[in-house]
């Protein structure tokens, strides 16, 4: 983005055309605005050399260095910028590279992301790049519960090789239910706590109410 912005500024000055914009850089700005609407006006500062961006927090707009953002925010910005760059190269004939077609593979989309971002990342990708097909891997229940079962594949390695199947349900499930029903966790609690709870229920089943009460308190 440093070099591209330099070229954009040189063209403006050389041609005295201050409405000129670089197509690739403009596409990056547009994609970030769609994908991360709380951010705007990403730009380069020369003294000291850095990349700044405006972020709206609780209704107030503040300017931050990109280095001040969380790892998740930086990863998402880098990912979106890289997709746009590749879309621009692959579709030079399009006035809007974000409408280009492509197949995009992303491994472990949830890495470094806050649960709020894990929840929204797939829908924001498909809204920002509507003509692209995304093949995404994840271990996050927050991602899975926001994907329709027809678009979700559970992969398991068996003695016969790799098995792929749609779950019976995914969209709208709680994170705990996804972990237990789709990802094989027997409990989301610490194992020792689960064992203690099971022991209490067993005492109640045996009508050992006093012992059960002592175990609780």
Please annotate each region the language model reported:
Residues 13-17, 64, 163-164, 185, ...:
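Residue-level detector of alpha-helix boundaries and kinks
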Residues 1-74, 81-98:
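Extended helical coiled-coil dimerization/tether regions that scaffold
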Residues 52-183, 192:
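Switch/communication elements of ASCE P-loop NTPase nucleotide-binding domains
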Residues 34-38, 86, 150, 185, ...:
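Phosphate/oxyanion-binding loops and surfaces in catalytic or ligand/nucleic-acid-binding neighborhoods
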Residues 15-22, 112, 187, 206:
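Charge-dense, low-complexity intrinsically disordered segments
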Residues 167-217:
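Acidic, Mg2+-coordinating catalytic modules of nucleic-acid enzymes
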